[in-house]
Swiss-Prot record:
Pfam assignment, any one: DUF494
The protein, known as: Protein Smg homolog
PANTHER family for the chain: PROTEIN SMG
Family membership noted in the UniProt record: Belongs to the Smg family.
Entries under InterPro entries matching the protein: Smg
Amino acid sequence: MFDILMYLFENYVHSEVELLVDEDELTKELTRAGFHQSEILKALTWLERLAELQEGDKPYLCNHDQHSFRIYTKDEMEKLDVECRGFLLFLEQVKVLNVETREMVIDRVMELDEPALILEDLKWVILMVLFNAPGHESAYEQMEDLIFEQPEEGRLHS
């Protein structure tokens, strides 16, 4: 499923090509690209749920204290190793993520069928969430820079 999400993001969203609106046409395109029907449906559902996080009358998170900190569940810690959790904290500290977008990222990570996520894959999930979060264009650009810039020697995070 993650491969399909990456394919869609790189070939449609990130390249600024208009995404096919018709789900049947998109499914046919993905099938022609070599993806299996069941994985295509999972990926499309994942994207629909991402879009749903942005919709509705209520914000994704209500009533959070700015001085609170995130305690990860056992399942979240299995999916997101120390490096990934540290990177999420780093992104919050440098204001790329806020509490709401961090929780959206964790929500989307937990819906992936991967048993654990590596840091590089987490970065792409973060990019997808920020791309779909209205009003977070600057954070998206910062995250894009973090993904595509060449790492410098001695840097803590790339």
